[in-house]
């Protein structure tokens, strides 16, 4: 039996809590200083590794003791991992660096079933962990004493006030343009959640802007990428996907394509380059470009949808937008999700009350959870598209092994795997056999509680607005009934708006969303710009032509807001809908925007009663 080294590290909290400090993540308000003290006891005859297979940390967070278990991520690299950069004179330099004894770990908090951790132990402890639903970051402090570490909540990192950042994907239907429309398609049963094992061999390309940003420090760039993939690998475990980094290319001399702010153009160019150049020099399943370019509008990432294994389209582009590694990792995970056939989440998609990773806007803090909808779409993608390239594990690795009950990976023949019996936190699962207990009715869902259906009448989805209707469990299913809402056209918000698909869209809230709390709706004269009929100001686009708004429709075109500094402020994006007045918005007394026209509310909704979102 192979003996595994167990290391215990006691973290002593420094006598004070800091109020503000500048760290790699940015300016941090409220942090704790800790000193890791490593105590190791090697079993007799054990071989010393630079980085142990497993480690355990005991420390306090907010005065409460926690135990953090870490396990080396042995699926992070393929054994034949290689990387390429370019010399100052343009020569290609390709190496196969040793990666077996690396320093990247996944982990969990003892007695917290929903906890996660992604940690680098290369030079101190650096990364993030989720504790009791809150995200914490940890990193070494750059004092003369190298043992000092800062631990702080993600929410305590100061962030610039700006419009929300979002994915640039606007068409997320299947290639046949036939979206999944039935609610039953978005119900993920316990059986469906036992996804088959899949492997994504990932190639990452780093553009020259990032090299410049890090002053040519390739070692620092590598560490940034390795931690990105460590987090991505951890997130995709919930879909039983192993993401292994097989190749890294750093454009240290110059970019190989024209990386530009037009995200659709950059995505197209990168796809062409991947097909014609990259695939010929390194086998892989999916390629992601990481860049410092500021894409047009609020876009921070874009990818082709349902494209995994396609020679050109199995790609994505990601802006290296944040100094927090977790944020960039989540963006790349999101774009890879599109490659796997997962569209953006709609209003009916849930993650147990937490934000979801496939929301079109990145949440704060960023989510590591796939929604019920995402899981159903991924399952459908596997069934309908049958992507062949992700069937096989990365070559020359020991990642593929016979099923092992207790390794927390769902493998062939297992119904569940919650770890060893002493560490299992999942009561539905018999840890000794990796089978579900015979009394289990459900494993997950809004109406599933401790493996049994919730009592009929238990509210499972609260009303989001006065236009929405709360839903309750039936007592016969783990899933919350399909979302329902009040009839479209019903007055709301004291007659400032009319209900539309469960919401009360008004311009004031749309301005708040785009430009922050100081913004309000602009004066009427600003909306007259929509009569111009150019690429910025219009009502509709037909046959590549911008159709100007008629006078009565000007408040159904581009949205104008007054943010004090600019009285006719607007937002432009490649997305035809972004920055436009939302459908269903009140444009005059008794009228709403419908198909970019200001029409009578009764005429707009004459055939509707109660709708359900899908």
UniProtKB/Swiss-Prot annotation:
EC code: 3.4.24.-
Localization terms from the record: Secreted
Gene Ontology molecular function: metal ion binding; metalloendopeptidase activity; toxin activity
Positions of the Peptidase M12B domain: 198-394
Signal peptide: 1-20
Active-site residues, as the UniProt record annotates them: 335
GO cellular component terms given for this protein: extracellular region; plasma membrane
Entry-linked SMART domains: ACR (SM00608), DISIN (SM00050)
Chain sites annotated for binding Ca(2+): 404, 407, 409, 411, 414, 417
Every Disintegrin domain range: 402-488
Cofactor info, note text: Binds 1 zinc ion per subunit.
Modified residues (Pyrrolidone carboxylic acid): 192
Disulfide bonds: 309-389, 349-373, 351-356, 405-424, 405-434, 416-429, 416-434, 418-424, 428-451, 442-448, 447-473, 460-480, 467-492, 467-499, 492-504, 499-504, 511-526, 511-561, 526-568, 539-549, 549-556, 556-593, 561-568, 587-598, 593-598
Tagged with keyword Glycoprotein: yes
Protein residues bound to Zn(2+): 334, 338, 344
Pfam families in alphabetical order: ADAM_CR, Disintegrin, Pep_M12B_propep, Reprolysin
Propeptide: 21-191, 395-398, 608-614
Keywords linked to the UniProt accession: Calcium, Cell adhesion impairing toxin, Disulfide bond, Glycoprotein, Hemorrhagic toxin, Hemostasis impairing toxin, Hydrolase, Metal-binding, Metalloprotease, Platelet aggregation inhibiting toxin, Protease, Pyrrolidone carboxylic acid, Secreted, Signal, Toxin, Zinc, Zymogen
InterPro entries: ADAM_Cys-rich (IPR006586), Disintegrin_CS (IPR018358), Disintegrin_dom (IPR001762), Disintegrin_dom_sf (IPR036436), MetalloPept_cat_dom_sf (IPR024079), Peptidase_M12B (IPR001590), Peptidase_M12B_N (IPR002870), Reprolysin_adamalysin (IPR034027)
Domain of life: Eukaryota
Tissue distribution of the protein: Expressed by the venom gland.
Motif D/ECD-tripeptide per UniProt: ranges: 466-468
Cofactor(s) essential for the protein: Zn(2+)
Subunit: Monomer.
Family from the record: Belongs to the venom metalloproteinase (M12B) family. P-III subfamily. P-IIIb sub-subfamily.
Protein name, entry field: Zinc metalloproteinase-disintegrin-like HR1b
Organism whose genome encodes this protein: Protobothrops flavoviridis (Habu)
Upper lineage: Eukaryota, Metazoa, Chordata, Craniata, Vertebrata
């Amino acid at each position: 039996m192979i003996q595994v080294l167990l290391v215990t590290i006691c973290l002593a909290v420094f006598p004070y809590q800091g109020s503000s400090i500048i760290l790699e993540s940015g300016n941090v308000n409220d942090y704790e200083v800790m000193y890791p003290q490593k105590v190791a006891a090697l079993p007799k005859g054990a071989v010393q590794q630079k980085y142990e297979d497993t480690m355990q940390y005991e420390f306090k967070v907010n005065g409460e003791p926690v135990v953090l278990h870490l396990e080396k991520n042995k699926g992070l690299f393929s054994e034949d991992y290689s990387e390429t950069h370019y010399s100052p004179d343009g020569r290609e330099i390709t190496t196969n660096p040793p990666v077996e004894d690396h320093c990247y770990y996944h982990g969990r908090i003892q007695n917290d079933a929903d906890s996660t951790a992604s940690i680098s132990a290369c030079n101190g402890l650096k990364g993030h962990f989720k504790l009791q639903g809150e995200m914490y970051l940890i990193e070494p402090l750059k004092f003369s004493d190298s043992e000092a570490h800062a631990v702080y909540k993600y929410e305590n990192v100061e962030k610039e006030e700006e419009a929300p950042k979002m994915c640039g994907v606007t068409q997320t239907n299947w290639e046949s343009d036939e979206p999944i429309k039935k609610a039953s398609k978005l119900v993920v049963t316990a059986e469906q959640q036992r996804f088959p094992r899949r492997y994504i061999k990932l190639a990452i390309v780093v553009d020259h802007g990032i090299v410049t940003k890090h002053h040519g420090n390739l070692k620092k760039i590598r560490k940034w990428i390795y931690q990105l993939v460590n987090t991505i690998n951890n997130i995709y475990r919930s879909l039983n996907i192993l993401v292994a980094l097989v190749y890294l290319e750093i454009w240290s001399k110059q970019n190989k394509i024209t990386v530009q702010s037009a995200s659709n153009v950059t995505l197209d160019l990168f796809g062409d380059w991947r097909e014609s150049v990259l695939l010929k020099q390194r086998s892989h399943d999916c390629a992601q470009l990481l860049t410092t370019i500021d894409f047009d509008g609020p876009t921070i990432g874009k990818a082709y949808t349902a494209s995994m294994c396609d020679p050109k389209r199995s790609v994505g582009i990601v802006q290296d937008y944040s100094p927090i590694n977790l944020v960039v990792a989540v963006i790349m995970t999101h774009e890879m999700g599109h490659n796997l056939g997962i569209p953006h989440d709609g209003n009916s998609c849930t993650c147990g009350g937490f934000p979801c990773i496939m929301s079109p806007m990145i949440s704060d803090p960023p989510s590591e959870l796939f929604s019920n909808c995402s899981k159903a779409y991924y399952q459908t993608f596997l069934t309908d598209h049958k992507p062949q390239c992700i069937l096989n594990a990365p070559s020359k690795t020991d990642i593929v092994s016979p099923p092992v009950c207790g390794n927390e990976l769902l493998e062939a023949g297992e119904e569940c795997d919650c770890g060893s019996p002493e560490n299992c936190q999942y009561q539905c699962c018999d840890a000794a056999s990796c089978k579900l207990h015979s009394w289990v009715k459900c494993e997950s869902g809004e109406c599933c509680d401790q493996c049994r259906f919730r009592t009929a009448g238990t509210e499972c989805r609260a009303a989001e607005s006065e236009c929405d209707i709360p839903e309750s469990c039936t007592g016969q299913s783990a899933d919350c009934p399909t979302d329902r809402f009040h009839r479209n056209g019903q007055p709301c918000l004291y007659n400032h708006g009319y209900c539309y698909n469960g919401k009360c869209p008004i311009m004031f809230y749309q301005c708040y969303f785009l430009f922050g709390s100081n913004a309000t709706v602009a004066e009427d004269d600003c909306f007259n710009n929509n009569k111009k009929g150019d690429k910025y100001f219009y009502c509709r686009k037909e046959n590549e032509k911008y159709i100007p708004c008629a006078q009565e429709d000007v408040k159904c075109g581009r949205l104008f807001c007054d943010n004090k500094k600019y009285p006719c402020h607007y937002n432009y994006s490649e997305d035809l809908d972004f920055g436009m007045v939302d459908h269903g918005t009140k444009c005059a007394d008794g009228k709403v925007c419908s198909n970019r026209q200001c029409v009578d509310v009764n005429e707009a909704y004459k055939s509707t009663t109660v709708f359900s979102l899908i």
